[in-house]
Structure formats: structure tokens, C-alpha cells
């Protein structure tokens, strides 16, 4: 194992460790024409039919849930990708026949302050004319309002995962999940009303 590229907390890094310092790079859309030029099977993969292709709208999660690795993998600082770049990436995939999108964010709406970002993205998807898509995401049901729920449905949300880990507020607190079950229930009702 001495030659492996890994790091163990509390030990000196081994030679050959790969580590990328954070950079202030702006996220740009994937260039799927380029990807197809180096991976000829891309279109074969996309022709497979009913599936979701991942698109990331942001990285990071501000929460501190005791069991989750997202804050280790992506960090606690949320970095929102520019709406124009996310929509450009979706447009490229759409033009290649993709209609199913999975927003691969740790949380599509990680906190209430990101509600407007989510609304702006969904409005841009509408403005781009991507009206026959369906999409899915992980969401925290404590970070919704009625307008956002309606936009989610109007833009093709077909599936979402809400991590309601426990019906016990005490257990939610002990797991450091940071939400109120009553708020989650009320916002789930918003989603039901939105359709």
C-alpha cells in the first residue's frame, strides 16, 4: 500500500498524493460535442431510452447531518453554477434526445436562501423551451414555498427524494439534520397541492 495515492488523517501524506487546491473557476457547460469526439459511444448511450442524465446545478451542502458524506466530498460552502451554463448543458443534451435530467446536487435547495436560485433556474428552463422534459432531484422539504413547488411541477419534476429520516423531532435533532418536522409536513402538502 505504500505506493497508493491516499491520505490517512493523522499520518503524513504519502508521496504521489493527488490533491487539488480549490480554485475560483467558474463552472461552464460540458461540451458534449467534444465528449462525443473522444467517446464515440456517447450517442449510443444516450439512445438507450428512458433514463436520467446528471446535471449539477450547485456543489456543497451547508448542513451537518451526522451520517452524510456530502460535506466531506463537496464541502459545506454551496457554490451555485451559473444558470446560463446549466441551461446550456441541458440544451446540448436535449438536442441529443435527452428528456430526463437528474439534478445531481447534494440538495437541489440546500437552504431557504437558495430558493430564488432554484426559481431562477426553473424559469430559465421554461424560457429555453424545454417543455417536454422530466427531472428529478434530492430536496429538503423544509426549503420550499408555494411558487417554487408550482414551478417544480410546471417544469417537469417527475421524481424527488426527500430524506425524512425520522418522525421524531428529537432524533432529527440528535442526527444534526437541522429541520423541523412540522415545516417538512407543511411543505410536502405544498408539493401535493402543486400537483
Where are these regions (language model features)?
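Conserved SAM/AdoMet-binding glycine-rich loop
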Residues: 83-194
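Acidic, low-complexity intrinsically disordered segments
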Residues: 1-96
Amino acid at each position: 500500500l505504500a505506493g497508493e495515492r491516499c491520505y490517512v488523517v493523522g499520518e503524513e501524506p504519502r508521496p504521489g498524493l493527488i490533491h487539488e487546491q480549490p480554485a475560483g473557476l467558474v463552472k461552464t457547460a460540458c461540451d458534449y460535442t467534444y465528449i462525443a469526439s473522444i467517446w464515440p459511444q456517447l450517442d449510443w448511450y444516450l439512445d438507450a431510452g428512458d433514463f436520467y442524465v446528471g446535471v449539477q446545478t450547485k456543489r456543497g451542502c451547508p448542513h451537518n447531518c451526522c451520517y452524510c458524506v456530502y460535506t466531506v466530498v463537496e464541502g459545506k460552502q454551496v457554490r451555485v453554477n451559473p444558470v446560463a451554463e446549466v441551461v446550456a448543458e441541458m440544451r446540448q443534451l436535449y438536442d441529443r434526445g435527452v428528456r430526463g435530467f437528474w439534478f445531481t446536487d447534494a440538495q437541489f435547495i440546500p437552504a431557504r436562501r437558495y430558493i430564488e436560485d432554484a426559481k431562477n433556474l426553473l424559469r430559465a428552463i421554461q424560457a429555453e423551451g424545454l417543455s417536454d422534459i422530466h427531472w428529478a432531484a434530492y430536496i429538503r422539504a423544509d426549503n420550499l414555498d408555494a411558487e417554487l413547488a408550482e414551478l417544480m411541477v410546471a417544469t417537469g419534476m417527475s421524481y424527488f427524494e426527500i430524506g425524512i429520516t425520522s418522525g421524531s423531532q428529537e432524533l432529527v435533532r440528535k442526527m444534526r439534520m437541522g429541520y423541523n418536522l412540522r415545516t417538512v409536513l407543511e411543505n410536502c402538502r405544498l408539493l401535493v397541492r402543486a400537483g
